[in-house]
A protein has these predicted regions:
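Loop-centered beta-sheet repeat module
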Residues: 171-228
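Outer membrane beta-barrel
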Residues: 33-53, 60-171, 203-209
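Detector for outer-membrane/organellar transmembrane beta-barrel domains
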Residues: 205-268
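Outer-membrane beta-barrel and related beta-rich outer-membrane complex signature
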Residues: 54, 127-129, 173-177, 229, ...
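Bacterial N-terminal signal peptides that target proteins for export
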Residues: 2-14
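N-terminal signal peptide c-region/cleavage motif recognized by signal peptidases
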Residues: 22-24
């Protein structure tokens, strides 16, 4: 009986000691989550260019110059967070513009909502390429594309899916018939046409012990409003994609079908 009481006493003392040490740590973590956080970053990039089709440049051994300067800001307070990136390129590559800028709300550890200039969930992300020039998909608005809208993300151990609605591309002018401003990071359908009311869905299943194999599919459908005819066409796309995330290797593969139906003066 005495031994039993002694063991119980030891257990009680040990439990009390553990609570004494663990509780302040938990309280500290909770306190840190309540404090506003701000993370600032950026980059400065230069570029050496030697083009085989430019005789003058070949004669002088190429050119070395300024390429891009960027500023990043990430902030959070409780469940609200934001992400902003501004880039300033050389004049030949577009000058300055906002690459992304959105606010978000964390519903829980797996679910969140983003609102603003956020990345379109279509195909491999963030990039469908391994080089400075990106892939052809970037130049048709299907790689690292950012538009104005709202996006829901669920990301769990094995499954990730995203659902989004985008009102339009990055809009800097709000006239009745003004064209989409060229000061944008993303490639979009522009000129006398405007992307409107676009819906996106993306699903990824993670395979392997370390989830290094990611197999997914993406769908996209939206309107294309013509400023001259005041008619709305449409565009839609479907993609299958796979990515291997190894320690030293990264393999990407993607196939897609894209279609555009414009309502220009010569088509109606």
């Amino acid at each position: 009986m005495k031994k039993t009481l002694l063991v119980r006493s030891y257990k009680l003392i040990l439990s009390t000691a553990l609570l004494f040490f663990v509780f302040p740590v938990l309280a500290q973590d909770a306190e840190n989550e309540e404090k506003p956080k701000l993370k600032l970053g950026g980059a400065l990039r230069f570029n050496y260019n030697l083009s085989s089709w430019k005789d003058g440049q070949k004669d002088r051994g190429g050119d070395f110059g300024y390429d891009m300067f960027r500023v990043n800001a990430e902030g959070s307070y409780k469940r609200i967070f934001l992400n902003v990136e501004y880039r300033l390129y050389s004049e030949a590559f577009g000058g300055g513009f906002l690459k992304q800028g959105w606010m978000g709300y964390k519903i829980n550890k797996e679910d969140q909502i983003q609102v603003g200039l956020t990345q379109v969930p279509f195909g491999l992300q963030q990039y469908n390429s391994h080089n400075w020039f990106f892939n052809l998909t970037y130049y048709v608005g299907l790689e690292d594309d950012h538009d104005m809208g709202i996006k829901y993300i669920h990301d769990s151990d094995r499954i990730q899916y995203q659902l989004a609605f985008f009102k339009n591309a990055e809009e800097l002018q709000f006239g009745s018939t003004t064209e989409t401003d060229p000061s944008r990071y993303s490639y979009d359908i522009t000129g006398r046409n405007k992307e409107i009311n676009q819906f996106n869905g993306k699903f990824i299943y993670k395979l392997g012990k370390d989830r290094q194999h990611q197999l997914g599919t993406s769908v996209q459908y939206g309107g294309i409003y013509n400023l001259d005819t005041k008619e709305t066409g449409n565009h839609h796309g479907f993609a299958l994609h796979y990515e291997y995330l190894g320690e030293k290797w990264n393999v990407k593969a993607q196939g897609m079908i894209i279609d555009h139906n414009l309502k220009t003066p010569d088509t109606i």
